Amino acid sequence: MKPNILLLPGLLNDASVFTEQVAALSAVATVEVGDLSIAESVTDLAASVLKKASARCFVLLGLSLGGYVAFEIMRSAPERVVGLVLMDTTARPDTSEASAKREALIKLAATDLDAVTEQLLPLL
């Protein structure tokens, strides 16, 4: 039986960011990409991903914002995660100011991606 891998993209990314990884990993694992575009908080994103995941247990990979969601999944359903990969994210807790900014960007991304891009570009 193939292992299950659940990939979580970053803010302003969708499944296409993992196209090549899905193609390569599909030879050895069942791979799916979580949709992080449908909720307004990290907690809600994690709940949505867990509800929609086809596998009961999986290796979880979080990229950027996906890493924050992965940590929330680890807090809420650790029994479902058999391995964790974090990329371009942080394990340090956000300050309350940083957390509020991130949550506002997630909420804004649901309605106005251009505005999110305008806010993030100067930070690059």
Model-derived segments and their meaning:
Residues 11-61, 75:
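Active-site loop/oxyanion-hole signature of alpha/beta-hydrolase fold enzymes
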Residues 13, 67, 91:
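Active-site micro-motifs of SAM-dependent methyltransferase domains
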Residues 75-76, 80-118, 122:
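Flexible "cap/lid" loop of the alpha/beta hydrolase fold
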Residues 62-66, 70:
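Gly/Ala-rich beta-loop-alpha elbow adjacent to hydrolase catalytic centers
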Residues 2, 54-56, 79:
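Active-site acidic short loop of glycosyltransferases
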Residues 3-10:
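Short beta-strand element of the alpha/beta-hydrolase
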